[in-house]
C-alpha cells in the first residue's frame, strides 16, 4: 500500500516546496521540471503530477516513493541536477 504524502512531508524529504510552488522564476521552473521528470520515470501520471505542482500551500494527497535515485546522471539534465542537489536530500532505498 502506498503512503499519502503531504507538502509538509515533501519538505521533510528536503524538497524546497516554497520554490516548487513559486511561479515565473527560472529556478522554480527548473525544479518543477526535475521533480516532474523523476516522478514520470517512477510511473506517475502527468495529470497527478500537474495537480500536485499546481496546488497552493494546502496539504496535497500525493504518492511519492523514497529512492536513492533522486539525482540525474544524464548530461542533458546537468543544470537541473545541480539545482536539485541543493533542494533534495537523497533517501535510502526501501527494504
Where are these regions (language model features)?
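Helix-turn-helix DNA-binding helix
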Residues: 56-61
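Short, Lys/Arg-enriched anionic-surface-contact patches
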Residues: 2-32, 62
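Amphipathic alpha-helical interaction surfaces
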Residues: 39-45, 66, 70-73
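Short, amphipathic alpha-helical "recognition" segments used to contact nucleic acids or chromatin
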Residues: 27-44
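Short alpha-helical "recognition helix" segments of helix-turn-helix
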Residues: 47-52
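Short Lys/Arg-enriched helix C-cap and helix-to-coil transition segments
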Residues: 69-95
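Residue-level recognition of short, structured coil/turn motifs
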Residues: 14-15, 54, 72
Amino acid at each position: 500500500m502506498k503512503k499519502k504524502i503531504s507538502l509538509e512531508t515533501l519538505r521533510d524529504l528536503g524538497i524546497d516546496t516554497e520554490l516548487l510552488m513559486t511561479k515565473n522564476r527560472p529556478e522554480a521552473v527548473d525544479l518543477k521540471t526535475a521533480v516532474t521528470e523523476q516522478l514520470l520515470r517512477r510511473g506517475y501520471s502527468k495529470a497527478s503530477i500537474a495537480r500536485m505542482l499546481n496546488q497552493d500551500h494546502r496539504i496535497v494527497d500525493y504518492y511519492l516513493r523514497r529512492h536513492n535515485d533522486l539525482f540525474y546522471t544524464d548530461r542533458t539534465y546537468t543544470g537541473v541536477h545541480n539545482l536539485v542537489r541543493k533542494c533534495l536530500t537523497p533517501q535510502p532505498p526501501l527494504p
